[in-house]
């Protein structure tokens, strides 16, 4: 067991600084961006880094006016983290295109798994991911 794991187990047993009123309670960590597991390849890190740079610099000037939940930059960050730069980039591009006037609005999460029909040579299929079905 690593040193951090041993300390965490001791804190939970002793009721130390990490303890709360409930037994085995975990502190909820809120993050603006996707915090789940993903493969940290160079292309994903580059794409996620560019989106994070946008969030920290230009997003404040543009304003918080996205029509979707999660916002387009959060969607892009998660799409690239889950599906890679190529698929996530196309998904993000089409999402930003849908965000303008006359586009969709509301809850539009990133799909957890893409079906077999989404291949690298068919980027037009990513256009159908966020469309409302009538």
Swiss-Prot record:
Taxonomic superkingdom: Bacteria
Major location category of this protein: membrane
GO cellular component, one term: plasma membrane
Alphabetically ordered keywords of this record: Cell inner membrane, Cell membrane, Membrane
A family per Pfam: YidD
Classification via SMART domains: Haemolytic
Topology with respect to the bilayer: Peripheral membrane protein
Protein localization: Cell inner membrane
Protein family per UniProt: Belongs to the UPF0161 family.
HAMAP family: UPF0161_YidD
Purpose of the protein: Could be involved in insertion of integral membrane proteins into the membrane.
Protein name per its UniProtKB record: Putative membrane protein insertion efficiency factor
Native species: Rhizobium etli (strain ATCC 51251 / DSM 11541 / JCM 21823 / NBRC 15573 / CFN 42)
